[in-house]
Regions:
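N-terminal localization/anchoring segments of enzymes in phospholipid and broader phosphate metabolism
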Residues: 2-501
Length: 501
């Protein structure tokens, strides 16, 4: 088988709804030499991501799917800055100025990326504010900003804040005794401009409020106080509205949300490290606190506060992105799944069972006999189901004639059927070996956890070949047949299904 989001001298409930004049910095465009005909890899990715964003503006795409595409474009851009932009900044810091095959030096490349990315971010928020939110409101799906809250909703917000949010917040006044803290990568934070004197008689200044990751970024509004079938408020709006209650005796004259993106790459030398897993575990502890590469801040944040934040994160003007909305659009990604509106989503796709395999799923034939009579077999995913491959591992786990199972795992959650059946096979006394690629980017921690789970089940776990990344999907089942050992092999590409069904 083969598989292929405010300067307010007095706080008001008014929130901006348009970005107004462009706040993008002046960044010189970079033009490659005329005799260079190769596209720049990073600019090519940004062009691809622009096509993703275009789907969020495509009226032929179901509305909730358009929201999902907006979130995907945001997630893509985050990862792009964490890895690609971070790498370019490291080259510049290291004094590397040689042009690449596309004719651009690292600094020219960064200038071109910045110019494109600023325009892209502005388009993202125009898509959200001017297109998607109004269209969702027409479908009785509404995100309520502070200036739209009536008395009942304001009372509910206060109660929700007091009971579900305030207990986990730890406001921090910024002064010589309380310096600017280390903020984790992509976390939601608020910088507060205070006036007055605190309980200890100290003059006010700036304060910081961090929103823990455990808090949901979008909160559904109870239907008895909501004018829409599906009503939501942003966590940032709730915290912003209640900021005065957190600073006794002081007046928050400005509240501004921001997010910092950091270098998220892991640096492990294949030649020097003796234990790849232990080295990755050590690097993972530092991932959330890498060098800052981008600052996203509320569009109406005053320059003095932006400059203060820039100094804290050692960022230049071109690294600052003013946004007119929530600083992490990706946190809207669960909304489409929470709303039961099939008319606003793609129709569910059910892959077909290849005719070659239909008999094995009604218990009429052993899959090994079936495959041996028809091998080789080509399966075309996702149009054809992955079930035959899962069935092969399921039957192998309980077949007394199977002696060994060997499989590669790249991005596979602990709830995968493959993991379930491999553990069953090991407990049944079969020799099970799994190659886990620990360096599957942003899945390293999950894969380390998976490796521990498999080892606890008696499975031999290895971590691939030093210097290479194991991306192919391979499976070998060794079975005794008529006094011979026969191998059943599956080779493919893509990720393995991760859900129990």
């Amino acid at each position: 088988m083969q598989t292929d989001k405010t300067m307010e001298r007095k706080p008001t409930n008014k929130e901006p709804t348009t970005a107004g004049e462009s706040t993008r910095p002046n960044v010189p465009k970079a033009t490659p030499a005329q005799d260079i005909h190769l596209a720049n890899r990073e600019l090519s990715f940004l062009a691809f991501n622009k096509r993703v964003l275009a789907l969020a503006n495509d009226q032929t795409v179901p509305l909730l799917e358009r929201l999902r595409f907006l979130c995907i474009s945001s997630s893509n851009l985050d990862e792009f800055f964490e890895i690609r932009v971070a790498g370019i900044k490291q080259k510049i810091a290291g004094g590397i100025d040689a042009a690449g095959q596309d004719g651009l030096s690292p600094q020219q490349e960064l200038n071109a990326i910045t110019h494109t990315a600023h325009a892209f971010v502005q388009e993202q928020y125009e898509t959200l504010n001017d297109t998607l939110l109004p269209a969702l409101a027409e479908q009785d799906i509404q995100f309520f900003s502070r200036d739209t809250w009536d008395e009942a909703m304001s009372a509910w917000v206060k109660d929700y804040f007091d009971n579900n949010i305030a207990p986990v917040l730890s406001p921090l006044g910024l002064d010589p005794a309380h310096p600017f803290p280390r903020l984790t990568n992509k976390s939601l934070n608020f910088i507060v401009d205070l006036q007055g004197v605190d309980a200890f008689g100290r003059d006010s200044g700036f304060a910081l409020v961090r929103a823990p990751r455990s808090l949901p970024r979008v909160i559904p509004v109870p239907k008895d106080i909501c004018s829409s079938e599906h009503g939501y408020v942003f966590l940032s709006s709730i915290i912003h509205s209640q900021m005065g209650s957190m600073f006794s005796g002081m007046d928050p004259v400005g509240v501004y949300q921001f997010k910092v993106t950091r270098n998220g790459d892991l640096y492990v030398s294949d030649e020097e490290v003796a234990n790849l897993r232990r080295a990755l575990e050590s690097e993972l502890l530092q991932r959330n606190f890498g060098q800052a590469v981008r600052l996203e801040v509320a569009a109406n944040c005053p320059p003095k506060i932006i400059k203060y934040l820039q100094n804290q994160f050692k960022l230049s003007d071109i690294d600052v992105y003013r946004v007119n909305g929530p600083v992490n659009l990706n946190r809207l990604v669960d909304i489409p799944d929470e709303i039961d509106r099939p008319d606003l989503k793609y129709n569910a796709f059910t892959p077909s069972i290849a005719p070659t395999f239909s008999a094995t799923f009604d218990g009429s034939m052993n899959i090994f006999d079936y495959v041996s009579q028809r091998s080789p077999i080509l399966l075309h995913h996702p149009y054809q189901s992955y079930d035959p491959v899962i069935e092969l591992v399921r039957q192998a786990a309980s077949d007394p004639n199977v002696l060994a199972i060997k499989q590669t795992l790249y991005r596979t959650g602990t709830q995968s059927l493959f993991v379930k059946y491999l553990m069953e096979a090991s407990r049944a006394g079969k020799d099970v070996t799994v190659v886990i690629e620990l360096r599957a980017r942003f899945d390293e921690e999950a894969n380390i956890h998976l490796a521990t789970l498999l080892q606890d089940a008696g499975i031999q776990v290895v971590y691939g070949v030093v210097g290479f990344k194991t991306h192919a999907k391979m499976l070998i089942v060794v079975r005794r047949e008529k006094k011979k050992l026969v191998k059943y092999v599956h080779v493919g590409t893509g990720n393995l299904p991760c859900d129990y069904r």
